[in-house]
Amino acid sequence: MGYRAHVCTTYRVQYGTGCFSAGACDAVNRLLENYEYPDGDGGRKSLVEYCDAEETVMELSREGLGSLVASLENGEAPEETDAVLDAGYTREDLISVFREWLDSSDKSHGFIRIEWF
């Protein structure tokens, strides 16, 4: 626990066209919230490190999202993937968006912050 609060001044949301439709929002959130990846000690860790009550702000483990991408590429998709596919997206769409998040997010952090709006 720290002794003083400090504000992060360099982390900003990149406004643009965004990813996924409103109809896929819940399905993508379920996929992210339920995915667990190996922690290196024989256990598993949650991909989502933080999620606000409205599920509009999420912080994802960079390592965990990379693990999810690898699983999708290897055909080892979690069952929650089906709901995203039913919303009109392909496995390749998921991989592409998640890779974009990995590539375009601030790499000085171990997490990736996404916001739904």
What are the residue ranges of the model-derived segments?
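Acidic (Asp/Glu-rich) sequence patches and key acidic residues
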Residues: 1-110, 116-117
